[in-house]
Amino acid sequence: MSRQLYPIDILGEHKVSSDFLVVELKRDRASDAVVGQTLRYMGWIKEHLCYSTQDVTGCIIAQQKDDKLDYALRQLNTVQFMRFEVDFRLIL
């Protein structure tokens, strides 16, 4: 099956190496379930978009991660976690 069934939040391509980066965004806390989701997207990209010289990495971005996600990511060198902060103020 070559049709992608789920939308990827952000798909980037490196300017020099042409490697792909799959970015999965989570609004609040990310758990280990997001690892499977990210790996599924990465697998699809590797199978359907990559040339033999291209690699795919993943990045999960959320405000927090739980312990389960931390343990799962320790076993993967192709997926990383990054935390974001938002400071939003309306000023009149």
Predicted regions and their residues:
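Charged, terminal alpha-helix-loop-beta segments
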Residues: 1-92
